[in-house]
Amino acid sequence: MNQLDALKQYTTVVADTGDFKQLAQFQPQDATTNPSLILKAVQKPEYAPLLKDCVTRWHGRAIDELMDRLIVRFGCEILSIIPGRVSTEVDARLSFDTAATVARAERIVELYQAEGLHIDRVLIKIAATWEGIQAARQLEQRGIHTNLTLLFSFAQAVACGQAKVQLISPFVGRIYDWYKKQAGANWDEAAMAGANDPGVQSVRAIYNHYKHFGIGTEVMGASFRNTGQIVALAGCDLLTIAPELLAQLAASDAPVARVLDPEAARRVALQPVQYDEAGFRYALNADAMATEKLAEGIRAFAADAAKLEQLMQAAA
């Protein structure tokens, strides 16, 4: 049995790509997208017609609506291939505006419904800022499920659990990147692998907290740099993995053992934690890595959304 099939025994495998033509070979349950992945896809010849068709068909509509229609088009194509859910992201430029995030999320869901898709097959991705988490709280109360992304800290995870969001995406690789950069020449790759990887440790702590206290929010590890990080999180509710790493897992027969387990998490001695807005902001501010990576991630997604808009305007 290859590593990919072995991993599927313990964890729901999700494909992290806008390149939906790659999906079938890996047979993922779910898929995730983001502005960067959509931007990357539409610059390929096989996907460029989707952008052109969207601009032509809805000519004269506001650019933000065209953006939503394009990402929903990709989502619909993905949902025709996978049996589960697709995560579609709200414009990152709204990350500090609760009301605007809710409005865009509702429009995205309406666009999916207009294509005959049930809202249970869609997760709305929102950056895990305080404002984003409050938007997710409102959306969940209205039956719209959310995926809180750009999650780098325990405080973000706790606040998401309090808001009863459907799913969170803690970013393993970007946490790893930060600590590796900080260490510089002192970084020991072998010593910091597996259970010692700071990104892996972050997800394990969040998973154990959720399972120990019976928090229903799903944990989906994201942003991997190597298959070792993935294997070290076997048993996590879900793991979203880029096609390149899915291929590496499928090509390897190395053993995969379950690492994360809800029963084991319930036996860990943990103290309950809760945050109000002031406590959340202070805890996030105290975490230099999470503060820097959240800001950097929002800037990057916002920049790629702007580039996508430029491509759409050029195609008009």
Curated annotation (Swiss-Prot):
GO terms for cellular component: cytoplasm. The active site is at K125. GO terms for biological process: carbohydrate metabolic process; pentose-phosphate shunt. It is found in: Cytoplasm. Keywords: Cytoplasm, Pentose shunt, Schiff base, Transferase. Its EC number is 2.2.1.2. Its main location: cytoplasm. It comes from the Bacteria. It catalyses: D-sedoheptulose 7-phosphate + D-glyceraldehyde 3-phosphate = D-erythrose 4-phosphate + beta-D-fructose 6-phosphate. It is an enzyme of class 2 (transferase). Pathway: Carbohydrate degradation; pentose phosphate pathway; D-glyceraldehyde 3-phosphate and beta-D-fructose 6-phosphate from D-ribose 5-phosphate and D-xylulose 5-phosphate (non-oxidative stage): step 2/3. Transmembrane segments: none annotated. GO terms for molecular function: transaldolase activity. Transaldolase is important for the balance of metabolites in the pentose-phosphate pathway. Belongs to the transaldolase family. Type 1 subfamily. Homodimer. This is Transaldolase. It comes from Acidovorax ebreus (strain TPSY) (Diaphorobacter sp. (strain TPSY)). The gene is tal.
